[in-house]
Design a protein with these regions (language model features):
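Binuclear metal-dependent phosphoesterase catalytic core
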Residues: 217, 221-247
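CN hydrolase (nitrilase-like) catalytic-core segments centered on the catalytic cysteine
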Residues: 57-73, 142-228
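Hydrophobic residues at beta-strand termini and immediately following loops
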Residues: 6, 100, 126, 198, ...
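Extreme N-terminal starter segment of soluble prokaryotic enzymes
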Residues: 1-5
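Short, acidic/polar
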Residues: 16-26, 143-149
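Cys-nucleophile CN-hydrolase/nitrilase-fold catalytic domain and related Cys-dependent amidase chemistry
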Residues: 11-13, 21-93, 97-99, 164-193
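Active-site catalytic loop in hydrolytic enzyme cores
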Residues: 57, 80-157, 161, 167-168, ...
Length: 253
């Protein structure tokens, strides 16, 4: 399976659909799934503008149509009746195949999501052409209940889309990155799943997003990783990478 990590710097506006289409059109022939970050259609600090900038599913039909040629995971502020959710979509075959509404909305320090979004209350597995999968959004995976849910379901692929700001620098590196890697690797090991993590880059109102998108094998090996702090689009053939990883384990184990 060929997964493309679309580590982008979205604008803080509704002017991001064309960016998605450009990447989709460029990489669709070499990809099975293209994965964008959390709120990739908007940027992160929408705050009061979330009400005017949120999309209905009809508003993004052009992206849904694009999934006739390649599966797509993306993030948006999703308007449903009178509620707005921080949502992750899995698009496939010209349809909205799955919607995950972020369960855990951070509301501490620099984060105020609970002020602007409704929370989701389910985290479900769904079938795709490439195996059973799940989607979670950023803070979701920092909760033991979600990790337990993933571990119980044991999907073949877990897509984790994020808007993680850089913080806690030290001589050893970026603390938030090492914390994320610990969570992602633990989830991969406990659930026996390939974990696909896509974080954004760029700056918004003093927040710098560190990127570092990656794919982790069920044995916790990092199969491929994007650069820090700059946009990058990277495609990985997970079948080959997993084969090589398992061969190295057998050789040295």
């Amino acid at each position: 399976m060929k997964i493309t990590l679309a580590q982008i710097t979205p604008k803080l506006s509704t002017d991001n659909i064309q960016l998605h289409l450009d990447i989709i059109n460029e990489y669709k022939k070499e990809s099975d799934v293209i994965v964008f970050p959390e709120l990739s259609l908007h940027g992160y600090l929408l705050q009061d503008k979330v009400y005017e900038n949120a999309y209905t599913l009809d508003d993004i039909q052009i992206l849904v149509d694009a999934s006739k040629e390649v599966d797509i995971v993306l993030g948006l502020a999703l308007k449903e009746r009178k509620a707005i959710y921080n949502a992750g979509l899995y698009l496939s075959g010209g349809k909205v195949h799955h919607i995950h509404r972020k369960n855990h909305l951070p509301n501490y320090g620099m984060f105020e999501e609970a002020r602007y979004f409704f929370k989701g209350d389910t985290t479900e597995m769904f079938d795709t052409s490439f195996g059973e999968s799940m989607v979670v959004v950023c803070e979701d995976l920092w909760r033991s209940s979600i990790i337990s849910r993933v571990s119980e379901n044991k999907p073949k692929y877990l897509y984790v889309i994020a808007n993680s700001p850089a913080r806690d620098f030290s001589d050893e590196g970026l603390l938030i990155e090492s914390q994320w890697q610990s969570i992602l690797k633990s989830t991969a090991l406990l659930s026996g799943t390939t974990v696909v993590f896509v974080n954004r880059t760029g700056f918004e109102d003093g927040l710098g997003f560190w990127g570092g998108s990656l794919v982790i094998a069920p044995n916790t090996e990092v199969l491929q990783k994007c650069h820090y702090f700059k946009p990058e689009v990277l495609t990985i053939d997970t079948s080959k990478a997993l084969f090589d990883a398992n061969r190295m384990i057998m050789k040295h184990g």
